[in-house]
Regions:
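N-terminal membrane-targeting hydrophobic helices
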Residues: 1-120
């Protein structure tokens, strides 16, 4: 889906209440679009760990405008599935990163080919 509002409208159809009941959660999932405006923004929160983080931030449940308690995890799962078709793990994402020298967090002065980490 292209916009958090569309996710929120989908949540309202699925769980009841109004789109505004869910918009904060969906805005949070897509917040990274503000600094990385293509599909790769999803690497930060669109995975199982992101769903559990949303639950820690927003609480285990929210109460929608119909007075129903809705698990935040269900809303997060819906968002990620609508965007990706499944719920990946953070490991699924991170394992696809091509390590770069700067990512190791240390300087490699004096490293020889025998001691250099593989892939560098």
């Amino acid at each position: 889906m292209a916009h958090p509002l569309k996710h929120a409208e989908s949540s309202a159809r699925r769980f009841g209440g109004k789109a505004d009941d869910y918009l904060g959660i969906h805005n949070w999932f897509d917040e990274s679009k503000s600094f990385f405006a293509d599909f790769r923004h999803r690497a930060l929160r669109h995975h199982a760990e992101g769903i559990f983080l949303a639950e820690r931030i927003f609480g285990v449940t929210i109460v929608n405008s119909d007075g129903k308690r809705i698990p935040v995890r269900y809303v997060g799962e819906q968002h990620v599935k609508e965007d990706l078709g499944r719920i990946p793990t953070a490991q699924d994402r991170l394992s696809q990163i091509s390590p770069q020298r700067w990512m190791y967090g240390q300087r490699f002065e004096g490293i020889t080919s025998k001691t250099q980490p593989s892939g560098l």
